[in-house]
Amino acid sequence: YVTAKDYGESGPIPMGCHGGGGVAITWQDKDNYWTFEPYIGNYSACNTPPLGEVPEETWYHVVGVWDGTGSAGAIKLYLDGEIKAERAPAKGNSFQFPGNKWFVIGGDAGAANEADRAYKGQIAVARIYDRALTAEEVKLLYDTLEE
């Protein structure tokens, strides 16, 4: 559950490290959309449609799901409890972290053992699961936050 101080200049909410394999949920300020980017051997991204003008400090519940079954699986992006994008991952995907030492929320685990690309906003809730969530589970998480 996130908000940006300024959606025009918020930056990414990366987790892990793109260089060695990782995932990122990112706000794309040029066209105002969210993207879920699992970098799992090959680049695969899933994007919401452009959201138009976004008022400052608008909160979003953003969930990225990769079912972990390689190129036979699916990458999904949910926004406020609803699926907004889905695609098959690029061929050859596998989760690899050969050189990574850190896992970062709100920045990228940089090569110099320090976080970089810091997110400019607030992250109220961040969760990581050891399995792919179903659409029903994502909706329940959103409904629970809204209560």
Over which residues does each language-model region extend?
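Extracellular glycan-associated modules
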Residues: Y1-E147
